[in-house]
């Protein structure tokens, strides 16, 4: 690797360790068939990756985001939460349906189970069926 290439990249990515992570990730992408943003000039993938970062044909922020996504095992999906719609009608029927007060919420009680009952319930569960995975 040319020292000039690394010095150009340090101006774009200040942390050398982060630069190594980003350049190696980009080099792996190039090896996997990602399109080049600059001419190769008989350079290997790590040098091409550093030249792309140094010439800013690919941004360090984009590479960082791609690196994070490639390392994630589970992708969190934000699902919209169901919203409750308040009643707009002031009719007597609507007043009968509407909750009376928040003190009713405090009166809600749940069934309690002793530890012995819980253990007896767990003992009655069927054990999982074992499969023979050695043949694969």
Swiss-Prot record:
Keywords: DNA-directed RNA polymerase, Nucleotidyltransferase, Transcription, Transferase. It catalyses: RNA(n) + a ribonucleoside 5'-triphosphate = RNA(n+1) + diphosphate. One of its GO terms (molecular function) is DNA binding. It is an enzyme of class 2 (transferase). Its EC number is 2.7.7.6. GO terms for biological process: DNA-templated transcription. NCBIfam families: rpoZ. This is DNA-directed RNA polymerase subunit omega. It comes from Methylobacterium radiotolerans (strain ATCC 27329 / DSM 1819 / JCM 2831 / NBRC 15690 / NCIMB 10815 / 0-1).
């Amino acid at each position: 690797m040319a020292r000039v290439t690394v010095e150009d990249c340090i101006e774009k990515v200040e942390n050398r360790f982060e630069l190594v992570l980003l350049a190696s990730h980009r080099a792996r992408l190039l090896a996997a068939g990602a399109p080049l943003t600059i001419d190769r000039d008989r350079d290997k993938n790590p040098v091409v990756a550093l030249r792309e970062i140094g010439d800013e044909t690919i941004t360090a922020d984009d590479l960082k985001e791609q690196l994070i996504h490639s390392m994630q095992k589970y992708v969190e999906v934000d699902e919209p939460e169901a919203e409750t719609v308040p009643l707009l009608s002031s009719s007597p029927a609507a007043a009968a349906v509407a909750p009376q007060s928040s003190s009713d919420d405090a009166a809600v009680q749940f069934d309690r189970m002793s530890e012995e009952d819980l253990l007896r319930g767990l003992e009655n569960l069927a054990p999982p069926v074992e499969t023979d995975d050695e043949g694969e």
